Regions:
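Polytopic transmembrane helical bundles with strong interfacial aromatic enrichment
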Residues: 1-305
Length: 305
């Protein structure tokens, strides 16, 4: 296949993934709507309700597979072939894949079925923004991006971002669920108790933080030194990545030493998530000096003479 054929294939599978995510969301919403008027203790899952739940899960799995094919096609379309992380479009495409994939992997292990409507809505919305406003033709990478440290650094950052995003959803639902006590119906009735949300959020944060540390404080500086002969350049994205690390460190420190749980911990977690997503998106649009800026054009990172 030619590079152009791979790019067309990638675009087609992005569209397929979007359609499958949309159908999955409809199935999940139908499942939840059938239970909307009953409190959790009175719910009786019918065969039809279970069918829509299974269908939503299957469609989400199919969407993730199509999403993965789109990523592979994007990387194969470049000459030479590369990882699909050269611009904001590709990074968002990869990040949404990780969020959806992490949800599927952790759905049974952590009992996250109740997170389905939010995760699928989030992924579908970001995918639409990515296609409509951020899409760019495949382009070669600059010299600084041709490094094995790029793969290690970005994979770590994406994995941590996926875990932190799921944890942030738990924290937000904790605040909503806790405020809506005592009697709840509809979607909130299916969401676990606040104590469970708090525990799941903590576990996801504990998983993501070491990976984020590895990405920000180890692989990032090594890659920067290799590309620009300096471990730290006071680049806006570097600074905000470190600020994000500090806020998440404060969250985990407060929980482990000061015993923070519940509402206070959830608020700090959401502040941390806000810094994370500002670093991911905001820097690209508010700072034209960032070496990591992917706001427009392919691979904005420049080499230094």
């Amino acid at each position: 296949m030619t590079d152009q054929s791979w790019e067309i294939l990638s675009n087609q599978f992005v569209a397929v993934a979007g359609l499958l995510y949309f159908l999955a969301l409809i199935s999940i919403l139908v499942e939840w709507a059938s239970l909307r008027r009953l409190p959790a203790e009175e719910v009786v899952t019918t065969g039809r309700t279970a069918m829509f739940g299974r269908l939503g899960l299957i469609l989400t799995g199919m969407a993730v597979v199509a999403h993965f094919v789109a990523l592979v096609g994007r990387g194969m379309a470049a000459d030479p072939n590369r990882v699909p992380w050269g611009n904001m479009y590709e990074f968002t495409l990869s990040g949404t894949f990780v969020v959806a994939g992490a949800f599927l992997l952790l759905r049974s292990r952590l009992g996250l079925a109740w997170m389905g409507p939010i995760v699928v809505t989030l992924v579908l919305s970001l995918l639409m923004v990515d296609v409509i406003w951020l899409h760019e033709p495949v382009a070669p990478l600059t010299e600084a991006l041709f490094s094995p440290w790029l793969v290690i650094h970005v994979v770590s950052a994406i994995l941590a971002t996926g875990a932190f995003t799921l944890a942030g959803i738990c924290s937000a639902l904790y605040l909503v669920k806790d405020r809506a006590r005592p009697r709840q119906t509809g979607y909130l009735a299916r969401v676990p108790p606040p104590a469970v949300l708090d525990r799941v959020s903590y576990r996801l944060h504990s998983f993501g933080f070491p990976i984020w540390t590895f990405a920000v404080l180890i692989t990032g500086p090594i890659w920067a030194h290799q590309a620009w002969s300096s471990y730290w350049n006071w680049d806006p994205k570097e600074v905000w990545a470190f600020i994000t690390w500090v806020v998440y460190a404060a969250y985990l420190h407060a929980r482990s030493t000061a015993g923070w749980k519940g509402r206070n911990a959830a608020i700090v977690a959401l502040v941390a998530l806000a810094t994370l997503w500002f670093n991911f998106i905001g820097i690209n649009f508010f700072s034209s000096t960032s070496q990591h800026s992917y706001a427009s054009g392919a691979a904005r990172i420049e080499t230094r003479g």
